[in-house]
């Protein structure tokens, strides 16, 4: 019996929608990274692009546990003096998409395939999204008993 290797014609890219209301950031990021890589499919191969599209709704309503609101998210442009520091509390008000995207990006592999997979991530602040024509499947994240409020 030969080992199955998926060809590009065998790969499909499904659409999933996740509601991020009161979901802890790390739990949301791990589930989204798994879907983006396509690890939920039987045809998964680490070298093949078998990932899915993931739509995350209500990005401004995610839950941050512990004292993350006081911590900062760092980004550097590569130029002298290009260090940018933004606190999570400020980013949650102005740009919650950046918080979620950076958490998911850290959970993807560090290779060329990660950029392709990250391009399939669609983050929306509200409850409505423009991807209804793709007929996304609802993906539920199991909540843990204790929640950060």
Curated annotation (Swiss-Prot):
GO biological process: negative regulation of translation; translation
Pfam families: Ribosomal_L13
Cellular component, GO annotation: cytosolic large ribosomal subunit
InterPro entries membership: Ribosomal_uL13 (IPR005822), Ribosomal_uL13_bac-type (IPR005823), Ribosomal_uL13_sf (IPR036899)
MF terms (GO), sorted A to Z: mRNA binding; structural constituent of ribosome
Keywords tagged on the record: Ribonucleoprotein, Ribosomal protein
CDD domains: Ribosomal_L13
Role description: This protein is one of the early assembly proteins of the 50S ribosomal subunit, although it is not seen to bind rRNA by itself. It is important during the early stages of 50S assembly.
HAMAP family: Ribosomal_uL13
Subunit structure: Part of the 50S ribosomal subunit.
Family that this chain belongs to: Belongs to the universal ribosomal protein uL13 family.
Protein name: Large ribosomal subunit protein uL13
């Amino acid at each position: 019996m030969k080992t199955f290797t998926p060809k590009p014609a065998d790969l499909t890219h499904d659409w999933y929608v996740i509601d991020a209301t009161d979901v802890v950031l790390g739990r949301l990021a791990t589930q989204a990274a798994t879907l983006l890589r396509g690890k939920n499919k039987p045809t998964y191969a680490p070298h093949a692009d078998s990932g899915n599209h993931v739509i995350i709704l209500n990005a401004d309503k995610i839950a941050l546990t512990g004292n993350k609101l006081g911590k900062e998210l760092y980004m550097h442009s590569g130029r002298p003096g290009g260090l940018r520091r933004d606190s999570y509390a400020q980013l949650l008000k102005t740009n919650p998409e950046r918080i979620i995207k950076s958490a998911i990006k850290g959970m993807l592999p560090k290779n060329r395939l990660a950029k392709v997979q990250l391009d399939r991530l669609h983050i929306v602040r509200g409850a409505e999204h423009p991807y209804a024509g793709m007929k996304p499947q609802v993906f539920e994240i199991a909540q843990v008993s204790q929640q950060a409020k």
